[in-house]
Design a protein with these regions (language model features):
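Short, flexible coil/linker elements and helix-boundary hinge sites characteristic
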Residues: 9, 23, 296-298
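Subset of outer-membrane beta-barrel
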Residues: 29-437
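Bacterial N-terminal signal peptides
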Residues: 12-23
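Sec/Tat signal peptide C-region and signal peptidase I cleavage site
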Residues: 24-28
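N-terminal secretory signal peptides that target proteins for export/translocation
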Residues: 1-8
């Protein structure tokens, strides 16, 4: 869900803050084996206003008729961080908070059981401020997650005697991981007539804490358990650039072309390694028996790839919009301390549109924005060297809180409903995801 308004409502701000912390607290329920690879599952990188349109956004600027009755240039009240060039059209101070509620269903091939989980996460929090409406300059500040790591995998096996081949003991191996990555950013957009240019810059940081715990199961012999744990932290400055070109293609129809680029970057990192034997205490906590090996603050690099995209929208004044994006990510360049992971370069196609029956009509549902879209493309993660086909279909609504023509305190609640699938019946794991934003 998304709320945007002029910031003059302390009660609403308090409510949104509470929702922010509730979303963070609920994150612990997520469990995705896919997030073991790369730097985890990528979070949707679009504002909720466009998620209902398949996640388009590179050529997106919403039209606000309060500031442009001649439809000469787009005038926006949506903070579209996907393309910072769109900031230049921002005409009101906007506070924007997005959060998701997700339902995950994970099924393993040839296994009837399935894993289910429901959890909530914060999508982003940002503030957009027009610096000069006349000169079309605006800036944005925000914080958003880029990826999430949450998994807990248990594997039971039988150990065999290497000489006789007979079964000796059972073992339980637990693979666990937490972490993710985030961007704290500031952005600036400036329009030069039909051309808008923009950039986002700030601090990109993250952590990955993963371990393998091995437990021999034997009723008569006591074995210490083994823990192999690694924690990596990285951080550094990043830069994203964007451009949009807007032109009329009819008396009340506009075309916007857009492009974005984020370049390959090496980030400084620190790594801690622990190899130890342990036992569990009465409350399930770990009690170290012997530290076999330990190494702290090992310096290195984490390399994130360049990502590039192009897109367009065509909009009929106060009526409809259609658009598409195409993006590529050079994930073959991804490295952690020089090591390649189970990832590969990927692409994604997004298509969507929206329709407003009567933007200034008396009927409320006529002023609602209705959205529909889909996206398709392989995930950047490879599971058992298998390409994970991925698609999402989406439906969205823009719910006006007040009629725009009667108030400068224009609030809008955007809802997005998405159904996504990663993998299929031929891959080792298939994941279905239902998301309410």
């Amino acid at each position: 869900m998304r709320l945007v308004s002029v910031i003059k409502r302390p009660v609403a701000q308090l409510l949104l803050t509470v929702l922010l912390f509730c979303g963070i607290a609920a994150d612990a329920q997520e469990n995705s084996p896919y997030s073991r690879y790369g730097w985890g599952n990528l979070v949707p990188s679009t504002p909720i206003a466009t998620r209902g349109m398949g996640g388009i956004g590179i050529g997106y600027v919403d039209y606000d008729p309060r500031y442009d009755f001649k439809f000469q240039y787009p005038k926006s009240q949506t903070v579209n961080f996907l393309n910072p060039a769109s900031y230049s059209r921002l005409k009101i101070t906007s506070f924007d908070l997005g959060f998701d509620v997700e339902n995950q269903i994970l099924r393993e091939r040839n296994v009837t059981e399935k894993y289910k989980a429901t959890y909530a996460n914060v999508s982003y929090i940002q503030l957009g401020v027009p610096l000069s409406r006349k000169r079309n300059i605006a800036m944005v500040f925000g914080l958003r997650p880029i990826s999430r790591i949450n998994y807990n995998i248990r594997n039971y096996t039988r150990e065999l005697n290497p000489v006789t081949g007979n079964s000796i003991d059972s073992t339980l191996t637990i693979y666990e991981g937490t972490g993710g990555s985030y961007q704290a950013y500031g952005g600036l957009g400036k329009a030069f007539g039909k051309l808008s240019l923009g950039l986002n810059g700030g601090y990109f940081f993250g952590t990955k804490d993963f371990s393998t715990k091995k437990n021999f199961i034997n009723d008569s012999v006591l074995y210490y358990k083994g823990n192999y744990q690694t924690k990596i932290n990285f951080g550094g400055l990043f830069l994203q650039t964007g451009a949009q070109f807007s032109t009329k293609i009819g008396s009340s129809t506009r075309l916007v072309l857009g492009a974005t680029a984020s370049f390959k970057k090496d980030f400084n990192a620190k790594k801690n390694l622990v190899r130890e034997t342990f036992e569990y205490d009465g409350s399930g906590g770990i009690v170290t028996k012997d530290s076999v090996y330990e190494e702290k603050d090992v310096a290195g690099k984490v390399t994130f790839p360049g990502t590039y995209g192009a897109g367009f929208t065509i909009e009929k004044e106060e009526r409809w919009m259609i658009g598409a994006d195409y993006t590529i990510g050079n994930w073959d360049d991804f490295r952690v301390y020089g090591q390649k992971d189970s990832v590969a370069s990927n692409w994604k196609l997004k298509v969507g549109g929206q329709f407003v029956p009567n933007a200034f009509g008396a009927n409320y549902w006529g002023r609602v924005t209705y959205r529909l879209g889909f996206n398709y493309g392989p995930d950047y993660i490879r599971y058992n060297n298998e390409e994970l086909k991925q698609y999402t279909v989406s439906l969205g609504f823009g719910l006006p809180v007040r009629p725009a023509r009667f108030s400068n305190q224009y609030s809008n609640i955007n809802l997005g409903f998405e159904f996504g699938r990663r993998g299929n019946n031929n891959t080792a794991l298939k994941e279905n995801l239902f998301r309410l934003s």
